[in-house]
């Protein structure tokens, strides 16, 4: 993937996560993203899986802030966010990506797995992606692309691979909104 494509995808993510539109990402923006996801799944703010997701997004913010040199009470500019994230993708590689983004994917996956069977079926996946603004038809097509073993269900590993592949330019299905 070219740096231009990565930068475009990361700019889109920055804009989505900048909830208050002030041109910077703060911890509150990451907390609001976790809340937004929880609400999309109809989860109560006090639910354990909501707290897990909030903690995961908090950890992601802490990582980004530390790498940008702004501290956990600071804020990241778009340039800092893109620089740190491109470094994660292009320099540090897949293992680091999994370590940093894995908890966020796992937290979202936990909310998506409504029947708690350890897998995400096509209906659960569609509920997630339609909450992000995709049509049901787009969600069905995305499921088919992400279900790499073709068993009609997604494991946590398949989902993390899909998120990573999007950021590495190997997949065009955006799963984190």
UniProtKB/Swiss-Prot annotation:
* Domain EF-hand intervals: 5-40, 45-90, 100-134, 134-169
Q: Which InterPro entries match?
A: EF-hand-dom_pair, EF_Hand_1_Ca_BS, EF_hand_dom
> Which SMART domains does the entry mention?
EFh
Other observations noted: This protein binds calcium.
**Which species is this record about?**
Saccharopolyspora erythraea (Streptomyces erythraeus)
Domain of life assignment: Bacteria
Q: What is the protein name given in its UniProt record?
A: Calerythrin
Record's Pfam families? EF-hand_7
